[in-house]
Regions:
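Hydrophobic core segments of alpha-helical transmembrane domains in multi-pass membrane transport
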Residues: 20-33, 65-69, 127-137, 151-161, ...
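Membrane-spanning helices that line or support transport/gating and their immediate boundary helices
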Residues: 30, 34-42, 46, 50, ...
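Transmembrane alpha-helical segments and their short flanking loops
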Residues: 159, 166-182, 246-328
Length: 328
């Protein structure tokens, strides 16, 4: 299988396509990072104060996590922010848990934005507007706003480049046969989603790639796409782990919760993969959803149901994590 695939990509045109994919991924990751960092600079102190004041219970923490992640477009950044607040002694572990849960739901906003038809066609216009605000105005807040807009445009431009490259790849028989294996080997899809997301440290990037692959027909079956999405949610926990290294015990426990929450949720959904698939298909047929929107629905269902499932067992999970990571 792999020998045929690597023989296929030796072709010069395929290498050029792959270089385009890598470039598109780089632009996407830079855009999402620029947007998030600029937003944190623009409203960072206010955002931290709001989070500190409003996360007095888990459910409020979930809402804050959804809101913040929906704005900065990165669940990893929101999770890392909550862990940094723990390390600074400004937040307790139970408060952070709500934010982590909400961040998982909030990150699905990006998938829904990608599902809008032809949104990538406006990416260069958005980039141009952002550049004008950066280079032609001296006001710091205007410059930061320009960076946010520029990052937003780069995000969609990078995804458009990746989508174009993937659609060309999908036309090749060898690549299509390789991707078809995900339908019959869900564990391979789970592993692929985990590894890719851990490497790029962006679940939104992996989700966007899955959307493009499913839309182009490279992943011909929804059943082949779902395990990759589930693996995506495992791989994204790497950021929380890295953020907690060298931190206080509470920060390490919050990172452990993120791993426990996402990994156990993925395992449960792998067990109920067929009912999960049937529910997504039902929504697809009910709303006449496009392939990209279908993946966005699947992403939302997993993260919402996973949160609703575990929110009632937070005390028990905290007790277990304290046993695994003892200390004060």
């Amino acid at each position: 299988m792999f020998q045929e695939f690597f023989q296929y990509i030796k072709d010069a045109d395929i290498i050029a396509i792959l270089l385009g994919l890598i470039g598109g991924l780089g632009i996407f990751l830079y855009g999402i990072n620029l947007m998030g960092e600029s937003l944190k600079t623009l409203a960072g102190d206010k955002m931290k104060k709001v989070i500190e004041k409003l996360t007095n219970n888990v459910f409020m923490g979930i809402l804050i996590g959804i809101f913040v992640t929906g704005i900065i477009q990165s669940s990893s950044a929101t999770t890392a922010l909550s862990i940094s607040l723990i390390r600074a002694g400004l937040m307790t572990m139970p408060q952070a848990i709500g934010i982590i849960m909400g961040a998982n739901i909030g990150t699905t906003v990006t998938a829904f934005l990608f599902s809008f038809p032809k949104i990538g066609d406006f990416s260069l216009l958005i980039i141009g507007i952002g550049a004008i605000l950066i280079f032609f105005f001296k006001n710091k807040r205007t410059n930061l706003s320009g960076q946010i807009i520029l990052g937003f445009g780069l995000l969609f431009y990078g995804m458009q480049l990746m989508g174009e490259g993937l659609s060309v790849l999908a036309e090749g028989e060898v690549f299509s046969n390789f991707m078809a294996r995900f339908e019959n080997q869900p564990l391979l899809g789970l592993l692929t989603g985990t590894v890719v997301t851990a490497i790029v440290q962006s679940s939104s990037a992996t989700t966007g790639i899955v959307q493009s692959l499913y839309e182009s027909g490279a992943i011909s079956s929804l059943k082949g796409a779902l395990p990759i999405l589930l693996g995506n949610n495992i791989g994204t926990t790497i950021t929380a782990i890295l953020a907690a290294i060298g931190g206080a015990i509470a920060a390490k426990r919050a990172a452990a919760f993120h791993v426990f929450f996402n990994v156990l949720g993925a395992i449960i959904f792998m067990i109920i993969l067929t009912p999960y698939y049937n529910l997504v298909v039902y929504l697809q047929q009910l709303t006449n959803a496009s392939p990209k929107l279908t993946i966005a629905f699947a992403h939302l269902i997993f993260n919402t149901v996973n949160t609703l499932l575990f929110v009632w067992f937070i005390k028990q999970i905290i007790w277990l994590i304290k046993k695994i990571i003892p200390g004060k």
